[in-house]
């Protein structure tokens, strides 16, 4: 299969904890990585792009060199290729879930030692065992091999006292295929739902590449319009995206900093172009006003609903949305008023009941008093009658 992707020999990846990024330089590494390309390598490239027969097993070699005067321990890990939220293919381990269409995960067909110790100023060859699935298939199994110095986190501090930990790693792409047959690309829209990116409200459109081939040079036009409120409209256009084989990612449509999500019905309209070709039949005008030709085009329309409780929850977590003080929230005041009214009616009912009980008690006392008075009069009459008889 023809791969249109240009993969660097080494993808120096920086994982930054915080909001400050830093360019990776060669001197950040205490070791170097050099893949030894085998005879069944496809094309002239600095990464593994192998053509293998069904069921074939093979051992690959990668040379690691320690360029320091101390022992360096290198951690090694294999991962399947995924697509991140920026529309960039990831070859290193991450938290992105594998797609439901991924039949052949590179992790199941390649293995490498977990770590290797490099003596000072020495080189060592690392062996990678790979096996092609026995079944015949068209397409590519894609992923990467990550090399990272153990305990290599470096902490930098800025003038405000913010500590930032940087992790540096070499990533060598590893592609395996049985033939060079072209796999026609496809694209699907799965779901559309509100979410957040970096604590900011967005509407995510999940795009899926269900084929075992790269989807290259993607240009995306997306617009979300309010159906319940026609004044609401959000757009997000991006260019030169790429998707890994059998992967999906959330394409975010920002609603803008400071804007609250509104509950209601919405409609997403999206057009995606793929694979540039001067003879392509689909035309797109890019951000510079230049016409671009593409071989493929996909159009999607999907209606969705944002619930009130979902909007409230996301708005409360959006760091750019101004929070309404509690004393300005009419719902809180209404709630307090209802509570006061409920308490008033409760006290009123209890007071009426107590008053009624007291009146009944007074009436009983009056009746008892009258009965006692009547008994006294009767006794008095009987006494007088006895005196007369005598």
Model region roles, listed by residue range:
Residues 2-26, 332-351:
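Sec-dependent N-terminal signal peptides of Gram-positive bacterial secreted proteins and lipoproteins
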Residues 180-188, 192-329:
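Membrane-proximal extracellular "stem/stalk" segments
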Residues 65-70, 81-83, 135, 208-214:
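Short solvent-exposed strand-capping/beta-turn motif centered on an Asx-Ser/Thr pair
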Residues 72-94, 131-179, 260-317:
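Terminal connector regions
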Residues 97-136, 227-261:
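Intrinsically disordered, low-complexity Pro/Gly/Ser/Thr-rich segments with frequent PxxP/GP/PP motifs
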């Amino acid at each position: 299969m023809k791969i249109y992707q240009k993969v660097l020999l080494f993808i120096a990846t920086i994982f930054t904890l915080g909001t400050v990024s830093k360019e990776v330089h060669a001197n950040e590494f205490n070791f170097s990585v050099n893949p030894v390309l085998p005879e069944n390598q496809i094309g002239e490239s600095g990464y593994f792009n192998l053509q293998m027969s069904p069921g074939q097993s093979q051992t690959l070699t990668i040379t690691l060199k320690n360029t320091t005067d101390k022992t360096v321990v290198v951690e090694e890990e294999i991962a399947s290729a995924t697509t991140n939220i920026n529309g960039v293919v990831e070859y290193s381990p991450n938290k992105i879930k594998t797609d439901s269409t991924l039949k052949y995960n590179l992790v199941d067909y390649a293995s490498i030692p977990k770590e290797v110790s490099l003596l000072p100023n020495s080189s060592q060859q690392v062996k990678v065992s790979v096996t092609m699935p026995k079944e015949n298939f068209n397409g590519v199994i894609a992923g990467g091999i990550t090399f990272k110095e153990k305990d290599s986190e470096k902490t930098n501090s800025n003038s405000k006292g913010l500590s930032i930990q940087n992790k540096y790693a070499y990533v060598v792409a590893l592609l395996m295929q049985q033939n060079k047959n072209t796999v026609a690309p496809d694209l699907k829209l799965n779901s559309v739902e509100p979410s957040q990116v970096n604590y900011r409200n967005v509407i995510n459109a999940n795009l899926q590449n269900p084929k075992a081939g790269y989807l290259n040079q993607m240009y995306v036009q997306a617009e979300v319009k309010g159906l319940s409120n026609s004044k609401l409209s959000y757009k997000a256009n991006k260019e030169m995206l790429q998707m890994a084989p059998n992967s999906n990612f959330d394409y975010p449509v920002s609603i803008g900093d400071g804007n609250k999500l509104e509950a209601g019905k919405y409609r997403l309209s999206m057009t995606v172009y793929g694979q540039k070709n001067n003879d392509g039949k689909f035309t797109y005008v890019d951000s510079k006003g230049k016409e671009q030709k593409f071989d493929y085009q996909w159009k999607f329309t999907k209606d969705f609903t944002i619930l009130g409780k979902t909007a409230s929850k996301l708005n409360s977590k959006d760091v750019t949305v101004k929070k309404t003080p509690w004393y300005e929230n009419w719902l809180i005041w209404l709630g307090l008023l209802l509570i006061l009214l409920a308490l008033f009616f409760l006290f009123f009912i209890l007071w009426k009941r107590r008053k009624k009980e007291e009146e009944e008690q007074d009436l009983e006392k009056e009746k008892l008093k009258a009965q006692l008075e009547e008994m006294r009069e009767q006794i008095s009459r009987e006494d007088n009658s006895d005196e007369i008889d005598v």
